[in-house]
């Protein structure tokens, strides 16, 4: 009897335990659901946010991801970027989601202070709140227990103010910290974050020296803070020291009078000696200059002196192709309608546009206000004959409408110059990243640029040529934002490709290993450019540890995000403003990932890439046409 009673009690306890566990699990998920409903009830939002008790929380609610592999099945991600949320976040709503790992509310119209219960969620790893209007100070008291699991914290483009709280130093796992475009002030010595790899504090009101552990960050991480100083910005200037009796006397006051007189004599002797030395060096310089001038007048290859009288003959009178090398030093191409010579270029006002893989580019404004771009090449290994042959090829290729027109070139022993048409709208890199506050590159423009660039590369490949240096700064734009590829097929004039900070992020893995470019590596580089247009990120290098440069591997980053099914986090925040382009964006993302396949043989040919982009663009245009037609019909029905 006793054993039967004991078995009954044990069985009852077991079933009660199971029931309690089930109730607890249900309560956890139910509490998550109630917290989300409270948030939706308090924050105005568009109708498309379909949160209600009649739908399954984990499978049907927009923006919600649950960890269904866990028996507790908790909400682990809330992703609502650019959905039109408006208002402040009440406490005890999202802050109740204690299993949350990812929270993305970027690109909405949220304002007010940041609830401390969100920042202190114990499991939170990724927090994206950029491009809202949050305000107030982030004091240490308001962050008593900020989540130590945070890996990415993005509070950029808000109106937060005050000092950067010292509580952030507790973020031992953080690798990305974005605080740019706020109103933070004060010093930044509290940011003792050894684990951080990428930091951006630009466009705040911060002051003081940059801490040692942040000095390897790029300059753009700190610009817009006029009171910040130290590497990578300008050196800090020592402050004025007020006189004090406690300060040591100047050394000269402690010298014996005789020694002081001796020191004066030494100083006078040094000054006289230096003056004589400078005078002697000046005489030597003048002698050398006179000899060099005589040599140039007698037939040397000086850049300034040998003009060949280009002004005496208009460029269009020279016939087809390149002018006779013996007649002129500045060789014009057939379609060049300008009339200037090398002396005009040398006298023109010049502005440095940038340094590329092959040399430095200058904008030169001639006396008749004509603007051209002069690229001064460096480390050319080709002979004069090889150089001229390559120029003929480049001149013919550049007749395609999607290449920057090459107007003329100059070759001498010491100088190699290329003269291009000046493109008024700059480069793709410039409009994407040059001014973060006014980027404004819409989807249609990006597709237009991708289409034209793919046609240019496809045409180049059809002629059996390789570009070898495809990157966003080499995609220049006309007044109508039509893309024109520059630096076409110049790679053959130089040594094997070099990996500079502005190129290595675009280079295919095999180029980095073998230093050999191919049409397949061109496809890879173009794939990186597409990813750049889709994500808004730059595949440039960042300073790393021990003076090594750690590359931001854009393809790898995109793959990792897509693998975690966070596809929405991949796309540029600017693109989320546009409606009904999600399908085209995903198709372009898939195409770009095919282009950046690690195996060269797995990449599509450029002809196929150009055709697929055309298909996506046609789909985009047809959907836009259908949308306009629907809107027009709706307006007509209302008016009737």
Curated annotation (Swiss-Prot):
Q: For the modification Phosphoserine, which residues carry it?
A: 349, 427, 518
Q: Which GO terms describe its molecular function?
A: ATP binding; protein serine/threonine kinase activity
Q: Where does the record locate the signal sequence feature?
A: 1-27
Task: Say if the entry is tagged with keyword Repeat.
Answer: yes
Q: In this chain, where does the modification Phosphothreonine occur?
A: 370, 445, 498, 503, 514
| Region annotation (Disordered) ranges | 299-321, 619-640
Sorted keywords for this record are: ATP-binding, Kinase, Leucine-rich repeat, Membrane, Nucleotide-binding, Phosphoprotein, Receptor, Repeat, Serine/threonine-protein kinase, Signal, Transferase, Transmembrane, Transmembrane helix
Q: Which residues form the Protein kinase domain?
A: 347-619
Q: Which residue positions are annotated as catalytic?
A: 469 (proton acceptor)
Please name the top-level EC class of this enzyme.
Answer: transferase
Bias class Polar residues marks the residues at 621-640
Q: Recorded E.C. number(s)?
A: 2.7.11.-
Which GO cellular component terms, listed alphabetically, does the Swiss-Prot or TrEMBL entry include?
membrane
Q: What is this protein called?
A: Probable leucine-rich repeat receptor-like protein kinase At5g05160
Species annotation: Arabidopsis thaliana (Mouse-ear cress)
